[in-house]
Amino acid sequence: MKVIYISNMAPASDNIGGTSALPYHLMVHRSDDVEVEVFTFNTNGLSAEKIAAVEKELRLKINVLPMNRLAAWLLGLKGVMSLLVRMLLPYPPHYYLRLDRATVAHIKAMRPDGVWIYGEELTGISRQLSEIPQVHTGPDCEVLYYERLLLQPWVGRIKRLRCRVMMRKFRRLAANAPTCARYHVVGAADRDMQLKINPEIDVNFLRHPHYNYNAERKIKFAEPRIRLVLAGRNDHYMHADAVALIDELAANVDLAEHYEFTFLGKGWEPMHERLRCAGWQSCLITFAEDYAEELCRHDVQLTPISVGTGTKGKVLDAITNGLLVIGTAYAMENIAVHHGEECLQYERACEVPALLRDIANDRRRHEAIAEAGRAAVLREHNRTRASQALFGMFAAKGL
């Protein structure tokens, strides 16, 4: 099978300048009979050296495309002008990316068995190649994201206005999505929202593949203190629930006898100081050269995600590397784990201190939960299995 992959971002083993890791891990363990050639606008700015390394890792060729003038102008805008123009456009900026005539002709001349398009906004490119069988990966539904964000009480008036404007753009995009493609998302609610907006399209939810992990790591909580980690950037995806969580930990400083805490990511300085001043042993790491290696130095990951869609890659990272994950519903959605069996889930931050006391009092039981979580994710989110499901969509009836 010969498949042409088209994306705004170049694929990479980690998320670089966007969600570049998902397509990488869907390709890295593909079947030997699936040949892929990549065409990308490289909006995430991978260097020539990095692109060459990815080509070798994925056993394929990457073609970097020039942007059409309109898209280059839109994506090059900065500051107030960028905000103003984006607000006035009927569609999100990446929608205006197009293949030039020579590239369209070249792809058609290759006579591929299918075209795989990555990025919800690239429906215009889908129309350029409408006669070729297509699979279009979201990977999430932006309308669902903005709808969930607007439910949050901490969203201010200006941000709320911007969210409503962007939600209308993405709703228009989804409503006009071409029926020449089959659509692929990594969230069940994302699929349902896409179908609610446009019942005419074929949308499929497939499990998100896990990323790289340390298969040799043994699950045994550290002595004398269990090592907690909160990983990721302190942004609107986590900030509100993270503040509530840190307040609870600061108020239950007796837990510091059993735990030490690490913030792994940017923007956590105020919360790091809050815990330290409360009496916790807290460490702040803003950058790790090898993220998986640093993650493996810990035992339990706290994931207080306030809002989001799809599948959270950092949660999969933690579980496959043998950490016990304690997270909100948004952190755990679309992952094949269940509370009390392969993970721990909470609704309100005030529940977390009791969970941590249970872990400290019964380490072995919770190590077993972490082990069960790793086994479930390695089985249900297996990269070979995910790749087979994705490329198998080209063989489905109607393509």
Give the residues covered by each predicted segment.
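Acidic donor-binding loop of glycosyltransferase active sites
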Residues: L295-G310, N321-L323
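Conserved catalytic-core segment of nucleotide-activated headgroup transferases in glycan assembly
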Residues: H208-R276, L284-C296
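A short, active-site helix/loop in glycosyltransferases that binds the activated sugar's phosphate group
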Residues: G124-S126, R168-I201, W268-E273, L390
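A charged, aromatic-enriched C-terminal amphipathic alpha-helix characteristic of glycosyltransferases
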Residues: R364-A395
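Acceptor-binding helix/loop patch of EC 2.4 sugar-transfer enzymes
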Residues: A72-Y91, H136-R171
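Conserved acidic donor-binding segment of nucleotide-sugar-dependent glycosyltransferases
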Residues: C343-C350, D358-R364
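Membrane-proximal helix-turn-helix segments that form the acceptor-binding/catalytic region
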Residues: R101-K108, E142, I158-Y183
